[in-house]
Amino acid sequence: MYRLKPFGVLDGREVPLIELFNDKCAVELLPYGAAVRAIRVPDRTGKLTDICLGYDELESYRTLDACFGGTIGRCANRIGGARFTIDGRSYRVTANEGENCLHGGIEGFHKKLWEFTCEENAVTFSYTSPDGEEGFPGAVRVEVTYRLIDNQLTIAYKAAAEQSTVVNLTNHTYFNLGGHSSGTVEDHVLTLRTSRYTPMDSGNIPVGTLAPVEGTPLDFRTPAAFGSRLHDKAFNGGRGYDHNYALDGGEGPVAELWCPATGIGLEMTTSMEGMQLYTAGWLTERKGKDGAVYGQAHGVCLETQHFPNAVNCPAFPSPILRKGETLQQWTAFRFFAR
């Protein structure tokens, strides 16, 4: 089922909050950014708990950074040097993180007001990115469908381009399975079905190779809590995780995240080959929902994606979408408590 509630006004247009709900859980969505605002699931005692970071007002989504819950595009993650070449033609896109392009530029998809349609258990958001937006070639039509069935939220992406361009879509929900206002995620236990990651240079740009996670702090093949690694100066300068994994593929979940305090967990499956693990190391203190105060390491993002900077790395799977092709990909989260 679904229902709409008032949330804000942007450029004279009403921006509603859209809630999908059933007898097991509920998800709140916003047309601004095609974003997830809240996910409420039962903890081990049956108490409904909101497990993702968000804001109480539209203005915060519009003006603040961090991309809370947003759909990221046209190209998620980083493009080194904010430039690339397709079919011999060079393009320069918006540099908004030093000399690099991050999450589609200054006004990425998470900063757009999307159209939407609702059905019984799903919402489909649509947006057409014009030719030249943030420097990217060709117009692209994008649809993102959120579907809630029982205790599973599936996010399905669809895109078509009018000329060859880069398309890499993801969702930037910050999960805190202790409850969105519960503080750091140091106690969260992560399991990943992946044996390799993409090494980066000093600017967080993948260098185009894969390396084994074995023997590094990136190895979560057996369940492990984040613990002190989220603040350890010897690991990523004390910023925690902001690393892309090359998923092993195959059937079944590629990630499990669990909070021992509440018993809430999630299993993630996806059609994508990569996943950025981000533990909010750059999240500055800010006011969130219900008077909560968020800060560094208060959330975990599991951003399924093409590899960062893949358009400049021939050995990586290509993120180029060509005219006549249709991009279709999906990620699903199954919530549980134990």
Question: What is each stretch, according to the model?
Answer:
Residues M1-R338:
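An exposed, glycine/acidic-rich loop-and-rim segment of catalytic or binding clefts
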